[in-house]
From Swiss-Prot:
This is Glycosylphosphatidylinositol anchor biosynthesis protein 11. Acts in the GPI biosynthetic pathway between GlcNAc-PI synthesis and GPI transfer to protein. It is found in: Endoplasmic reticulum membrane. Pathway: Glycolipid biosynthesis; glycosylphosphatidylinositol-anchor biosynthesis. The keyword Lipid metabolism does not apply. It comes from the Eukaryota. GO terms for biological process: GPI anchor biosynthetic process. InterPro entries: GPI_biosynthesis_protein_Pig-F. Glycans are attached at residue 99.
Length: 236
């Protein structure tokens, strides 16, 4: 009786496939989506300067009035910041279309309009998440405008209103690492986180003027925006 032959086991190198998939994902993130060159020009220094100015001009004494004036200061600063974003966008530099450069003013102005429109659903979200409903509605809405201009506007300029491209980017593998290397997106994420942390001091029994709604949330958003931009630059 002939001896039984041992069945040979086939093995597949999943490590190789994994590395190939990761490399493909990194290639897609680098080529299909807008990127920004890390630079001191795209650090949102104006975020730190503006929140300092708001306190300097009496934010704790006249919350509504100073926040309203702050919006009229923030809009031109964001327009300038948006222009700097277009000059540092790597995809913009690689494209050969001449129309893109001609439409920069329209892109920047349209981004402001869209951000102001997006402040309405953001205002509703703030109410649903616990913002005072019986009082401070005007202050909450001004907060939503500040947040929308800080968080949405730079991304709108970078992605040129391409919602589908942004969704595909957020759904791609390695997106967290890509966000950490993108000054615009990291600033937006840390602005959101800063706003969330800004809620913490409000109920504390310290009896300070700066604990009034929504000063700490506004402060957290501006600081988060600045920290995101400078952290990406320093740790790139």
């Amino acid at each position: 009786m002939p001896p039984k032959l041992k069945a040979t086991r086939k093995s597949v190198s999943f490590q190789h496939l994994s590395d190939e998939d990761i490399s493909k994902s990194q290639y897609i993130l680098k080529t299909e989506f807008p990127r920004i060159e890390t630079s001191t020009l795209t650090i949102p220094f104006h975020s730190a300067l503006l929140i300092f100015g708001l306190y300097k001009f009496g934010l704790t004494n006249d919350i509504y009035g100073v926040m309203l004036k702050g919006i009229f200061s923030l809009i031109p600063l964001q327009l300038l910041y948006g222009y700097l974003i277009t000059t540092r966008s790597e995809k913009e530099k690689k494209t050969k279309s001449h129309n893109n450069s001609e439409n920069v003013p329209l892109l920047l102005a349209g981004g402001i309009v869209i951000s102001l429109v997006l402040s309405v659903p953001l205002f509703v979200a703030l109410i649903l998440l616990g913002a005072p409903l019986a009082s401070h509605l005007k202050e909450t809405y001004l907060l939503s405008i500040h947040l929308s201009l800080l968080i949405f506007y730079p991304s709108l300029v970078l992605y040129k209103y391409d919602y589908k491209s942004l969704v595909k980017f957020l759904d791609a593998d390695g997106v967290y690492n890509a966000i950490a290397k993108n000054q615009i997106l990291l600033s937006a994420v840390l602005a959101v986180i800063g706003t969330w942390f800004g809620v913490i001091p409000i109920p504390l029994d310290w009896d300070r003027d700066w604990q009034q709604w929504p000063i700490t949330l506004l402060t957290g958003a501006y600081i988060g925006s600045f920290v995101g931009g400078i952290a990406c630059f320093l740790f790139q």
